[in-house]
């Protein structure tokens, strides 16, 4: 059970995040808007969080409307702030960018504010995921007991400032989470599950235990040097590719929230060129580079565990 002191830290850290976000919103509102472009994505309905998305239609908002939506989005932390038909398990995404004219001093002040907010968000995430000592299944209940309706992913998400970018382009990224494992590491994972028997619907406790035992035996029968990997697909994500002319470099950013471009004009760029995010269509994805697929055999579907050929 998490201590009273930890609960107090959880609440205090979150209140600081809220206050700092309010102050940042005001500071950003006081700046002159040079350009704004954000892309509204369809709402994810309840029980549809894990459904694969073949298409994602995009609705564009520009100018002052984009700025207003961006500022609201940064503080969208609770399910009470959204439609009751929208999933409470999927954080709202609003890719795009707002570009603001600032002096060098204002730029440094805003960068410091954003850095402080991101540090508070990291502290909040650590309190929930590490300091609480709770397993993932218990964290949700604990957090929502103290902060009812909180969308935890939105609370964790950091803000991304850009310093005098030249161009901002948007696109979609299809990715997999890949983790290489040894046979013995997988056996240890399965052993832990075997030592904590439970029912996992639709299976009874005994059926689940039997299933785990079969999985353990299948892995134990592999050679010790077998090459195993967890390869789990991640939902398609909006990304931004930002070009900095002064440094002659391109940086790719995840873009679940509007990027904050702070334009001081000190690097010869007055207003960056902001591109458009096109609708996503899984059947027409064009890959810049697609490496040759490795030969894999699926061993345990629920873990996305694969055996790589020698």
From Swiss-Prot:
One Gene Ontology CC term in the entry:
cytoplasm
The keyword Cell wall biogenesis/degradation belongs to this UniProt entry's keyword annotation: no
GO MF term set = DNA binding
Q: Cross-referenced SUPFAM superfamilies, in alphabetical order?
A: Replication terminator protein (Tus)
Protein location: Cytoplasm
> Which UniProt keywords are present, listed alphabetically?
Cytoplasm, DNA replication, DNA-binding
The cross-references to Gene3D superfamilies, in alphabetical order and at most eight, read: 3.30.54.10, Replication terminator Tus, domain 1 superfamily/Replication terminator Tus (3.50.14.10)
Q: Name one GO biological process term.
A: DNA replication termination
Known function: Trans-acting protein required for termination of DNA replication. Binds to DNA replication terminator sequences (terA to terF) to prevent the passage of replication forks. The termination efficiency will be affected by the affinity of this protein for the terminator sequence.
Q: Which family does it belong to?
A: Belongs to the Tus family.
- Please report the name of this protein according to its UniProt entry: DNA replication terminus site-binding protein
């Amino acid at each position: 059970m998490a201590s009273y002191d930890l609960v107090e830290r959880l609440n205090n850290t979150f209140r600081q995040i809220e206050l700092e976000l309010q102050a940042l919103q005001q500071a950003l509102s006081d700046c002159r808007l040079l350009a704004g472009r954000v892309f509204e994505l369809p709402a994810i309905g309840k029980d549809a969080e894990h459904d694969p998305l073949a298409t994602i239609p995009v609705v564009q908002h520009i100018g002052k409307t984009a700025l207003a939506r961006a500022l609201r989005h940064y503080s969208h932390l609770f399910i009470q702030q959204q439609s009751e038909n929208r999933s409470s398990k999927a954080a709202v995404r609003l890719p795009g960018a707002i570009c603001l004219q600032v002096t060098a001093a204002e730029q440094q002040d805003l960068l410091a504010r954003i850095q402080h907010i991101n540090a508070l968000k990291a502290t909040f995430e650590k309190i929930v995921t590490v300091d609480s000592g709770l397993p993932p299944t218990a964290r949700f209940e604990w957090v929502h007991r103290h902060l009812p309706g909180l969308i935890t992913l939105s609370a964790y998400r950091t803000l991304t400032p850009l310093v005098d970018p030249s161009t901002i382009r948007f696109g979609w990224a299809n990715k997999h989470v890949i983790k290489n494992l040894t046979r013995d590491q997988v056996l240890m994972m399965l052993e832990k599950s075997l030592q904590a028997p439970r029912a996992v619907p639709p299976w009874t406790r005994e059926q689940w235990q039997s299933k785990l035992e079969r999985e353990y035996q299948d892995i134990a029968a592999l050679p010790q040097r077998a090459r195993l990997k967890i390869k789990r697909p991640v939902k398609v994500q909006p990304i931004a590719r930002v070009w900095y002319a002064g440094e002659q470099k391109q940086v790719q950013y995840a873009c679940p929230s509007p990027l904050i471009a702070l334009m001081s004009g000190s690097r010869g760029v007055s207003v960056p060129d902001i591109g458009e995010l096109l609708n996503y269509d899984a059947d027409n994805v064009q890959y810049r580079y697609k490496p040759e697929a490795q030969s894999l055999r699926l061993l345990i579907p629920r873990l996305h565990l694969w055996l790589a050929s020698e």
